Amino acid sequence: MHPFSFNHIALSVKDVNESIDFYKKVLQLTEIKNTASNSKTRWLSISEGKQLHLIPRPDAEIKTNKAVHFALATASLHTFIKHLEELKVEYSDWLDTPDKDYIRKDGIVQIYFQDPNGYWIEINNDI
C-alpha cells in the first residue's frame, strides 16, 4: 500500500484577484509564493503546509454543485459563522436552509457557502 497525504486544492477561477481577496478576507488564508512556476497561478496557505492554488481561467466554464466541495475544519465554528455574517456572506445547511447549520448523525456541525466562482466550501467542527 502507498500512504498518501493531502497536498493542495487547485481551482480554476475567472478573476484571480477577486478570488484571492475572497479567500484572504473570508477564510483568512495567507498568500504564499508560487514556487512551481512563473505563471499567474496564485497560492494560499491553508495550514500545515497544505495549499489552495487559484488558476486564472477567465474563459473557462465553471460548473458546480454542492456535492462537489472542499471542507475545512475549525474548533471555533460559531465564531466563524459570526465572521461570515459580518461579511454578509450567505451560508446554509446541507439542505439549503439559509443561515442555518447542520448537525450530522455523528454530531459534527457543518455549514456551506460559495466563493465568487460558485465553488462550494464546507466548514465544520470535526477537529
Language model segments and positions:
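Conserved beta-strand in the GNAT
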Residues: 52-55, 122-124
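Short, charged, low-hydrophobicity "junction" segments
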Residues: 22-28, 56-70
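Structural preference for long, well-ordered alpha-helical segments within the folded cores
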Residues: 21-22, 83, 117
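Short secondary-structure boundary/capping segments
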Residues: 1, 34, 43-44, 60-62, ...
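Core segments of cupin and vicinal oxygen chelate
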Residues: 11-51
